[in-house]
C-alpha cells in the first residue's frame, strides 16, 4: 500500500505543476505583454523539463510495479499513470523541452500573422513545429503504429487514422447533401448593425453563468482564439469579439462553457489525480457542442436570447424570435471552423 500512496502523492504534485504550466499558457493568450514572448518560451521550456523529469522518475516505475490498488478507482488511476509513464519514457528530455519552448514562441508569431493577414510570417515556425511533432510521434509510436496514430492517442486513446477516415468517409456524403439542401432553401435572415464590445462581454458572462458555469471557480476573458483551460476549481474560458458579428462571441462563449462545465462537474474526489480531467477530446467536444447547438441554437433558447439582445443592443436587424432562430441556424460555406454552422463544422 505504501508504494501506491507514494505514487499518488508524487503524481498529485506533478499534476499541480502541470496546472501551473497551463496557467502560463492561459496568461500568454490573455494577459501577457506581447514583448514577454521570448521569456515565456523559456519559462515554458523550464516547466516542461521539470515535468518530464518527474514523469520519468525511476521511482515511478518502481511504485507502479509494487502498487496494490484496492478498488476499481485505484486500478484506473494506476492504469492511466502506467500508460503515461511508459509513453513519456520514450520522449527524450531535450525534445520535450524544445517542443514546449517552440510551441510557446509560435503562439505569438501566429497571432501577429493572423492580425496582419500575412501567413508568410508564420510558415517558418509552423514548419519547425511540424518537424518537432514528427520527431515526437516517431519517438512514442508503438510497434506497427504510424506516427499519426501515435499523435492521435494524445487526444483519443485507442483510435487509429484508418478508423477516423472510415467514420469521416461515412459522414461526409450525407453532410454535403444536407448542406446543399440548406443552401438551396430560402435565405435565412441576418442580423445587422454594430454591437458594442463591452455589452457583448457582459452578455457573454451572463450566458455562461446561466448555463451552469461557476464563476467563483473560473473567469471569462478575451483571446485571439477561444479556448477553455484548467480543471477542478480553476477552469477558465475565453471568447472573442467582432462588433459586426455578436454570434462570434455568443456561440464561442456557449461552446467553451460546455467544456468548462464538464471539467467543473468532475467528482471533486478525482481532482489532481489521473482521473481528474475529461476522459477524451471526443467526449470533451461532445459536451461543448451539446451546449452550443442542442441548447444554444434551440428554439426555446433563441426566444430568451432575442429578448436579451433587444434589451442590450436595441434593433438587431431581425424582426422576432423566429427570425433570430433562423439566423443562428443559417447554413453557409466558410473557412473558419470556430465560426462554422452546425452542418459545416463537421465538414471541417
Question: Model-predicted segments: where are they?
Answer:
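Active-site recognition of the HExxH zinc-binding catalytic motif
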Residues: 7, 141, 241, 245-268, ...
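Short acidic (Asp/Glu) and glycine-rich catalytic loops that position anionic groups and cofactors
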Residues: 21-28, 81-85, 184, 233, ...
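Short, glycine/acidic-rich hinge or "gate" loops at secondary-structure transitions
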Residues: 122, 186-191, 270-275, 301-310
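Hydrophobic/aromatic-lined pockets within catalytic cores
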Residues: 156, 176, 180-183, 208-212, ...
